[in-house]
Structure formats: C-alpha cells, structure tokens
Amino acid sequence: MKEFSYVIQDPEGIHARPAGEFVKAAKSFESSVKIAKDGKQVDAKRIFGVMGLAAKQGHEVTITVEGPDEDKAAAELEAFLKANL
C-alpha cells in the first residue's frame, strides 16, 4: 500500500475539469485508489465521490493506492496533483 498527502493549491479547489481528469487517471490503474479529506474516504475512480469531497484551496487530501501497480499509480497520481491542482 502506498499513501501520500497533498495540499490543494488551485484557487478553485477540485472542480469539474481536473476532477474528471484525475478520475480518468485513477481508472487507468488496476490498483484500488482512494482519496480522503477530513476523515471521509471515497473511491477516486468515481467522479461523484471525488467532487463530493468539496476540497478547496488549502485543504489536504490523502491518496491511498493498493494493488499490483501501486508504485506507478502513486507516483503518477501525485505528479498529476502537483501539475493540475
């Protein structure tokens, strides 16, 4: 299992476009991908769950990846967040 945290930098927070791209990226991996904020954890492969977190600028999210490609998934998803959010 791999886990990392990220503080949202985008002034708009996790909004529709980057949320959709993040979900698409998460779906490209076989591993289970979860995203959590303030103790609420959701499936990162489901757009409504990701949007439902209502993560705004300055909020910390925690990503947990578990499965056969977890190393690659964690690295690529962390890079995605840094580049887009």
Segments from the language model and where they lie:
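C-terminal structural segments of small proteins and small subunits
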Residues: M51-L85
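Intrinsic-disorder/low-complexity, polar/charged segments enriched in Ser/Thr/Lys/Arg/Asp/Glu/Gln
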Residues: M1-S5, E60-T62
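Generic cytosolic/nucleocytoplasmic N-terminal low-complexity/intrinsically disordered segments
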Residues: M1, A36-G39, A83
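Compact, glycine-rich, soluble single-domain proteins
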Residues: I8-D43, F48, G52-K56
